[in-house]
Amino acid sequence: NCFLSSTNKILIGDNVAVTEHTVILDNIHGDFRDNHLTFNENPDVPDVFLQEIKDRPLASKGPVVIEDSVHIGMFCTILPGTKIGHHSIIAAHSVVGRKIPPYSLVAGNPAQIVVTFGKKNNSI
């Protein structure tokens, strides 16, 4: 129950756990342009804009690199250009969009480092 989308490269190391409902992307659907925006005209639905993405090609924003012995919790999103260092833990529901150093526990949206642990303590 995971979703991976790649137009460039997604590298996943050894002993990596990717749990349910995780999304890993190395691309986006191009730029938003004013002439592609439409607005919801149904008065029963809150005002939200609808973006037609079917006509916008996928564009690479850099590879995703997940090094060895990483654990990615449920419902995470790994964004283009992300590098996750070895022995790191990504907490459930986190959104990661930057470089994460090895031996890090990150959580949140956007993901922030909660703690960095040493090689001797990598059994968190």
Which positions does each model-derived feature cover?
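Flexible, glycine/small-residue-enriched loop-and-beta-strand segment within the central core
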Residues: N1-T82, F117-G118
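C-terminal/domain-terminus segments
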Residues: I72-Q112, K120-I124
